[in-house]
Structure formats: C-alpha cells, structure tokens
Amino acid sequence: MNILAFGEIMMRLSVPDYKFLTQTNELNYIITGTGLNILSGLKNFGYNTYMLTKLPNNNVGKASSANIRKLGVKDDFITYGGNHIGLFSQNGYGERPSEVTYLNRLNSSFCESKLQDYDIDKCLEEMDIVHICGIAMQLTDSVKEIALELARKSYEKGIKVFFDFNFRQSLNPERTYDDLVNDYKKILPYCHGLFASYRDINKILNIDSLNIKSSSELIKKEYDIGIVAGTMRRFDDMNNRFIKGYISNDDGYFESREYKLEIYDRVGAGDGYVAGIIYSYLENMKSEDIVEFGVASSVLAHTTYGDNSLVSTGHVLRLMNNEKIDILR
C-alpha cells in the first residue's frame, strides 16, 4: 500500500524545560508538518509513505530531507528551491498555554512553490491514497492551486483522497474563515475521507443547531464522502482532559469510548488520530474498531515527545484491548 501526503515541512523550535524564550540561549528543533506526522505513523503501521513538498535548496533543506528519511518516509517526490523553511516555536506548561509563533512562513520554499515544480502525474503512478493537509488551502494562491490539482487528478485516477480542515487563522490574516470555506467547497467533491470538527462542518453547511452525528451525516451526503471522522475533547472541573473519536460512514455513526489524557506533548496528536483512522480503514476493520483504533493512536501520540507519530500497531492494539503494561519485556 502506497500513501502520498502533500503539505509543508516545518521546523519546530522548542525551548528546553518549558522555559520562556527570554529565559534561555538554547533551542531544540524538530522537522515536522501535518503530512509528515501522518506518514510517519502510517510507516510505523507498515505502509510505504511518500512526501510531496518543496524544501529550500541549502543545508537546512538537506537536513530536513535527512530527518524525513530517518522516519522511513520516502523523499522521491520532494523538490528543492529557494532558501527558507517555515519556522514556529511552541511551548507551554500547565495553566500557561502553548503559543505558536510563525516566522515568515508565507515566504517559505513551499509557500512560494508553483504547480510546475511538481510532476503530479508521476507522483500518482503507484499511489493508493493521497492525503492533503487543509493548511495548504490557507497559505498562498499557488499552493492552493497545487492542492486542488492534486485532488482533481487523484480523483480522476481513482485514488482515494483524504483531507483535513486544520484551520489556522494566524497563518494568513488577510484571508477570512468565509474565504477558506469557499475554497474548501472546491476540494470536497474530490474527497473520499474528511477529518473535521463540529464547528468546521457547520460552517461548511451554514448551520448552527445540529449535533456532530447529524452534521457529519449531512456533509457526508452533501459531498458524497465515504468517511467523515474527528475527535471531541472536553475538560472537567478538575481540569482533567478527555478525548473520544467519531466516524460517520456507510455503516452509520460511531463513537469511541472516552479516554482521560496524560499529556506529554500534544502537538501532532490529531495527526496520530488521522494515521490511525486511515490505517484501520485500509485494513477493513469493522467501523467500531476503526474509530477505536484511531482514538487510541491519538491518545498514545499525546505521550510521545515531538510531533511525529512513532507508535506501532502493537502499541495501539494493546491500548484498545485495555492491556495495562508498565514494562514490555
């Protein structure tokens, strides 16, 4: 099974020991990005994974591609040009929320890439699944054009497209949420799988009164989507955090059991859910097991340092089966 993801590769800068940036002279970095995080998870689940993106033609780009290969993700379709990679810093602890600070992201090699930089037909020759990150629709007009063309050609070739909304208002302040909704409506007819929140779906459908079950079933019918999936989070009075997943497909609507979260590093946990849903869907699991596998994958991603999903199917299945093991020997 071959899976391609289109999206931006980022460099995440982290301050050690949860300090403020003003308190340190040191930074750690991780090569990350929604597509890469999902692919690393699917690679660990046993699939062949390929990244479609553009990196700077310098040592930063070389280091990034080396990190991509280290995760087992193939870089055959990565192109090079320009001299800048998108940067962001993000750290928080306890009641102090993490803050994401983007550094000149819209001028990165990826954001300045053009359709002619990619041989899309060649990239799709042996692909079974394509994932397109919704952030690609929020950046520059040229990147949006690439995402739409990739979705269209994949659809025409019978390759299933999975798409997530992943809205980030701070990425491009000049574009409103309504602008983005109109662009999402252009790509949805090509999509087989959709990852979305209750808010996202209601905005697309221009409704505000339905629950997630009704909303997901409506958007599935409206755009002839095979599977709609997402997570639901809540807090209790003690500030404990909980998560569960949902899917809506041809078999009906299903929710997972709820997990109390132990959070080591939340960034990338949603990508862990996407990887889990795609894997269990491709493995033809029962609908009840698809959503349980997906949310278990996300729960484990909360316990992993860094954005990239690194857990195995064994890890996920043990959690699904409620096997409490402190040490694997």
Regions found by a protein language model. Give the residues of each.
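Histidine-anchored nucleotide/phosphate-binding helix
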Residues: 33-44, 147-153
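Short catalytic helix/loop segments, enriched in acidic residues and glycine
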Residues: 20-39
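Conserved N-terminal subdomain of the carbohydrate kinase-like
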Residues: 48-134, 316-329
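Positively charged, low-complexity intrinsically disordered leader regions
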Residues: 1-20
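Conserved post-catalytic alpha-helical subdomain immediately downstream of the catalytic base
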Residues: 238, 253-323, 327-329
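Catalytic-core regions built around general acid/base machinery
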Residues: 146-157, 182-190
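Conserved phosphate/ATP/ADP-binding segment of small-molecule kinases
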Residues: 168-250
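A short helix->loop->beta-strand "cap" motif at the edges of active sites that frequently abuts
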Residues: 154-160, 223-226
